[in-house]
Amino acid sequence: MSFDNYLVPTVIEQSGRGERAFDIYSRLLKERIVFLVGPVTDESANLVVAQLLFLESENPDKDIFFYINSPGGSVTAGMSIYDTMNFIKPDVSTLCLGQAASMGAFLLSAGEKGKRFALPNSRIMIHQPLISGGLGGQASDIEIHARELLKIKEKLNRLMAKHCDRDLADLERDTDRDNFMSAEEAKEYGLIDQILENRASLRL
């Protein structure tokens, strides 16, 4: 896994065959930990999907831990992660550290029920999908895009309502504008199941 613009630490492991060097994220992948850090893009989603599929092939019966620190991003890229989380056999436990906003919050809520966590000072934000970049073209084309955006909004609200055990009307109301929550508020809303003060408080 490569992360641009900053140095990724290397971990040295000793074995009977000598030393092996891993970048820190590859080492954590051995512990079945997958990271989504930064915007949800086609590239970051592809990395997450590949790691989820790899971990399923390694052990289809052992949980995967998906750590999220993301401001959100592409709906289609995020849905590729979402569909893979549901497609694979292992339970996917989600954990927010830092922030989970927009598509990041949606993926956080989509973890296995009872296994969705946040650290105490995490921030979670939900809202309706946005059009990124300038939208131009003929009026009929803009109308097509508007209809598609409304379909996406309805689908995301319906799925998140299911994950949060809430009425669809609640999500339609609460995602109308940027809706920021603390970890405690996210738990009360149903986006997560538990706030982790430390590793000892983890209950699976």
UniProtKB/Swiss-Prot annotation:
GO molecular function, one term: ATP-dependent peptidase activity
PROSITE patterns: CLP_PROTEASE_HIS, CLP_PROTEASE_SER
Keyword Phosphoprotein belongs to the record: no
Residue numbers annotated as active site: 102, 127
Subcellular location: Cytoplasm
A biological process from GO: protein quality control for misfolded or incompletely synthesized proteins
Annotated Pfam families: CLP_protease
The protein's Enzyme Commission number: 3.4.21.92
Substrates-to-products reaction catalysed: Hydrolysis of proteins to small peptides in the presence of ATP and magnesium. alpha-casein is the usual test substrate. In the absence of ATP, only oligopeptides shorter than five residues are hydrolyzed (such as succinyl-Leu-Tyr-|-NHMec, and Leu-Tyr-Leu-|-Tyr-Trp, in which cleavage of the -Tyr-|-Leu- and -Tyr-|-Trp bonds also occurs)
Enzyme's top EC category: hydrolase
Main function: Cleaves peptides in various proteins in a process that requires ATP hydrolysis. Has a chymotrypsin-like activity. Plays a major role in the degradation of misfolded proteins.
Similarity comment text for this entry: Belongs to the peptidase S14 family.
Summary of subunit composition and partner proteins: Fourteen ClpP subunits assemble into 2 heptameric rings which stack back to back to give a disk-like structure with a central cavity, resembling the structure of eukaryotic proteasomes.
Protein name per UniProt: ATP-dependent Clp protease proteolytic subunit
Organism: Neisseria meningitidis serogroup B (strain ATCC BAA-335 / MC58)
Gene expressing this chain: clpP
